[in-house]
From Swiss-Prot:
Transmembrane segments: none annotated. It is found in: Host nucleus. Its main location: host cell. Plays an essential role in viral protein synthesis. Plays also a role in active nuclear export of mature particles before host cell lysis, by interacting with host XPO1. GO terms for cellular component: host cell nucleus. It comes from the Viruses. It comes from Murine minute virus (strain MVM prototype) (MVM). One of its GO terms (biological process) is exit of virus from host cell nucleus through nuclear pore. Interacts with host SNRPN. Interacts with host XPO1. This is Non-structural protein NS2. Keywords: Host nucleus.
Length: 188
């Protein structure tokens, strides 16, 4: 219906222009004695035309493929960078950073510095294992193998990511022990 109404409006305007074309004022504006209008009714589907040339089609396909690949590569690059960053972080590093005064709050084993800035809470439930307070250590820390000839590497990507998802250092060490990762006990 909308197409028919549009066509009727176009025909009405064309007929009006043809009727008025013989009048003196109208012909003076167009500076032409005999005005002829030629038109074509254009529908919405006429605006998207398929390309006729094979070369242009291949260029379009190539551009679309390149765009898709660039988006995929950006995503993969970001994931690979994150994995590399996590790969360099060992279990010992997480303990070392968790035991730093600026990373702990409400700590009784760090000293008299008081509460720090960061969000990690240092209690007997989330102890770093290096503090001077043995009651914070618990049996889980002593049960971990402390000597290993193997380097502190991760066997699979998913296991290490699950270790990093754990909230506290204690949970990380427990998860690492479940996965068979070794804690070498070295301090730097």
């Amino acid at each position: 219906m909308a197409g028919n109404a549009y066509s009727d409006e176009v025909l009405g305007a064309t007929n009006w222009l043809k009727e008025k074309s013989n009048q003196e004022v109208f012909s003076f504006v167009f500076k032409n004695e005999n005005v002829q209008l030629n038109g074509k009714d254009i529908g919405w589907n006429s605006y998207k035309k398929e390309l006729q040339e094979d070369e242009l089609k291949s260029l379009q396909r190539g551009a679309e493929t390149t765009w898709d690949q660039s988006e995929d590569m950006e995503w993969e690059t970001t994931v690979d960078e994150m994995t590399k960053k996590f790969g360099t972080l060992t279990i010992h590093d997480t303990e070392k950073y968790a035991s730093q005064p600026e990373l702990c709050t409400n700590s009784t084993c760090i000293g008299s510095r008081g509460p720090g800035f960061r969000a990690l809470e240092h209690t007997k439930y989330s102890c770093c294992g290096h503090c001077r307070n043995p009651e914070h250590w618990g049996s889980w820390f002593q049960s971990l193998p402390r000597w290993s000839t193997e380097p502190n590497l991760v066997r699979d990507r998913g296991g290490f990511e699950s270790v990093l998802r754990c909230g506290t250092v204690e949970e990380r060490l427990q998860r690492a022990a479940e996965l068979g990762l070794r804690y070498d006990g070295a301090s730097s």
